[in-house]
Design a protein with these regions (language model features):
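C-terminal non-catalytic scaffold/interaction domains in large multidomain proteins
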Residues: 1-217
Length: 217
């Protein structure tokens, strides 16, 4: 009987007899191996163990030695997130007193604008990911304009249920939002269209306003 990789992973995650040892490796829990916490957490652990600051090169070498199934480019991607501060070849974790980087204004994002009623309008390409219901990247100026700063999350109510928008400082794909598939279907959006979304940051709502070229409202 064929067993999918997804089914195997689901079984491993739900079995206390096994522990994740790296991105792709699992081992028996009774071997007393530290559980792999993901790239961001492993980086934070190593920075803390080094006294709060460590050479970027030394950190990379340590991670690659401990987790040979992780690429250096992936580690560097996480080091470039807001969770870390790289200074002169060394890295430390961002502190509460560290200011966030300056975020560009909303008008730097193509298709995004403030409306006179206080809402924020954006357009997103209707891709296979949108139609499949995948989560989507949100441009930082958009997240800021709708009230989602780094480290925060917010649910926007729609006619089809809430759509979360979150900005995890340790997540390379952040800020991001949940599925808008139902919003796209509601206005008959098709692959290749530009879906118009309207956020109301005051009341916390989100709606689709048609597709560009055939706006409905």
């Amino acid at each position: 009987e064929n067993t999918s990789a997804r089914a195997v992973l689901k079984a491993l995650h739900g079995n206390a007899a096994f522990v994740r040892a790296s991105r792709t490796r699992w081992t028996l829990a009774d071997r007393e191996v530290f559980a792999y916490g993901g790239i961001a957490q492993e980086l934070k652990n190593r920075v803390a163990d080094a006294g709060g600051r460590v050479s970027v090169r030394a950190l990379l070498d340590d991670m690659l030695d401990a987790f040979p199934d992780i690429k250096e480019s992936s580690i560097r991607t996480y080091l470039a997130t807001l969770a870390f501060v790289v200074e002169g070849g060394t890295v430390r974790c961002r502190r509460p007193e560290d200011p966030w980087p300056v975020i560009p204004s909303l008008n730097t994002v193509r298709g995004a604008s403030h409306r006179s009623d206080g809402c924020v309008r954006i357009t997103i390409p209707v891709t296979t990911q949108v139609l499949r219901g995948s989560g989507l990247f949100v441009e930082p100026p958009v997240a800021q304009a709708i009230g989602v700063a780094p480290g925060l999350s917010r649910d926007f109510e729609t006619a089809h249920g809430p759509v979360p928008v979150a900005w995890d400082p340790a997540e390379p794909a952040a800020p991001n939002m949940g599925s808008v598939r139902q919003l796209a279907h509601a206005v008959d959006a098709e692959l290749g269209d530009l879906l118009v979304l309207i956020f109301d940051p005051v009341v916390g709502t989100l709606r689709a306003d048609g597709v560009e070229g055939k706006i409905t409202g």
